[in-house]
């Protein structure tokens, strides 16, 4: 599913955010990526959907070598990946339905198929009754549910979640985690960067810890391992 072999990422300012990364992630796994702020977690996950390109080494996702992927090929590659952000990144002038449908309209799906699929995923995230609302009319938890619906509407094999509970209260964070669990149980691989100690220590999955651009710990059903 995902393979990194001797991956380095050095930025123009001289910072090395990935320092010899090697990892294999199987289809259907749920991975927490943890570590101190500035450790290289975001770079690690961004290289999986070519938001960042490795300076050297090999990054394979769904059988595609991202190191050799041309820029014009990136949008097509990303159709099999859903991304969930901490700050939701919804289009403020579009309704809930339109935000989720947008991903399918871009790839020119038939309107009838779009409507059916969008309503299916909104039912899954519990927002079928709010299809006509704008993001500004929703709570933070509801906005994150829309973001998750948008990320799965293409039926991706992989979801990358960057601090998906970071802006949410504890109760809402648990709701979002249970939703991600449900999606994972259907066979979707989830890679989630997080600082949420309680979530990692309670809902057990594989834990990959990154410090100074290196993987320092990789444990099945691991703990968060940091204070706070």
Regions found by a protein language model. Give the residues of each.
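Conserved ABC transporter NBD signature motif
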Residues: 57-65
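Conserved ABC ATPase signature
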Residues: 133-138, 142-144
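A short, proline-enriched helix->beta-strand linker immediately N-terminal to the Walker B motif
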Residues: 153-157
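Short coil-to-helix segment of the ABC ATPase nucleotide-binding domain corresponding to the Q-loop/switch region
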Residues: 94-102
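Catalytic Walker B motif of ABC-type/P-loop ATPase nucleotide-binding domains
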Residues: 159-162
């Amino acid at each position: 599913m995902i393979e990194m072999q001797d991956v380095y990422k050095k930025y123009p300012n001289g910072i090395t955010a990935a320092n010899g990364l090697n990892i294999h992630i199987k289809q259907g796994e749920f991975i927490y990526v943890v570590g101190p702020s500035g450790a290289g977690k975001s770079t690690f996950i961004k290289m999986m959907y070519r938001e960042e390109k490795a300076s050297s080494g090999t990054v394979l996702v769904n059988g595609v070598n991202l190191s050799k992927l041309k820029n014009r090929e990136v949008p097509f590659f990303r159709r099999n990946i859903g991304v969930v952000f901490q700050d939701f990144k919804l289009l403020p002038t579009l309704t809930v339905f339109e935000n989720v449908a947008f991903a399918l309209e871009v790839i020119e799906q038939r309107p009838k198929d779009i409507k059916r699929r969008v309503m299916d995923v909104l039912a899954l995230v519990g927002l079928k009754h709010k299809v006509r609302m704008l993001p500004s009319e929703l709570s933070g938890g509801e906005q994150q549910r829309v973001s998750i619906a948008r990320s799965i509407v293409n039926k991706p094999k992989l979801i990358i979640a960057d601090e998906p509970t970071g802006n949410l209260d504890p109760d809402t964070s648990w709701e979002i985690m249970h939703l991600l669990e449900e999606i994972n149980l259907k066979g979707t691989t989830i890679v989630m960067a997080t600082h949420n100690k309680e979530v990692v220590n309670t809902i057990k999955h594989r834990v990959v810890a990154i410090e100074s651009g290196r993987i320092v710990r990789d444990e099945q059903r691991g703990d968060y391992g940091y204070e706070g």
